[in-house]
Amino acid sequence: MMKKAYVYFCFVLAFIVVGCDDGATNPIEVKVQEETVLTRDDIKEDVVKDARDGETYRTVKIGNQWWMAENLRYAADSSLCYNDEEYFCKAYGRLYPWIIAMNLDTTYRRNGAIYADVIEPSHQGVCPKGWHVPTKTEWETMIEFVKAHNGTEGDGTSLRSPEMWAESGEGTSKVTHSDRFGFSVLPAGRHTDPMAGYDGNIYTGFTSYAYFWTSTEVNSYRNDVTKAYDVRVCGHWNDRAVQLENDKSKREAMSIRCVKN
């Protein structure tokens, strides 16, 4: 059922310095004059089949965008399973280094390369035909819609699946997971940059964080193009738990959610 409430507000996806802050973030400002509070019953759902491997994915319409409501499981070369265990790929989807997620030719697979000339506005990457790796702007659009239509509920609460998240630890005693929009974020964690000085094959964040690559590169004033934007969902907070990051190396492996062309 849909109910309407007229609220004037401004949400700012702020820089969190405790608990959910482990990297550089950019604020996502949302200005809404009229809010329509949506429930799960208002969200359209469908299913898409990946013709390459026969995998099927639940999809949801959030605003004007159709999103996969599950992490991609396509077994691209050099994609990973958390802790190198196949179970995690089946339950949480695969983890992809940015270059692999973008499905770029080996000619371009070199550290420091700028890929703007080979990345399409709707870049398919490892997604099935008719779908693509979302841009930074497409993620921002979705997050803005969620924050404009979830009432007083936090963005983390609205997007997280009620399954698999840690039930103990800093801040988690008051954390809720409504999955209001059916997006069903799972705490799949990530694989760290093997060239960043970490000791060994390090997977991190499982049960507490989800990380999703965008197709948008970070091109700073220092011309640092070894990084790309990602979206991190933290399990320790209800509000301001969804953050856009710009400090992760393209060598790190993260989850992929595809968006429809």
Protein language model features and the residues they cover:
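C-terminal motif of bacterial Sec signal peptides marking the signal peptidase cleavage site
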Residues: 16-19
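Sec-dependent N-terminal signal peptides
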Residues: 6-14
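Conserved positions within compact, well-structured domain cores
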Residues: 23-261
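Positively charged n-region of N-terminal signal peptides that target proteins for export
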Residues: 1-5, 21-22
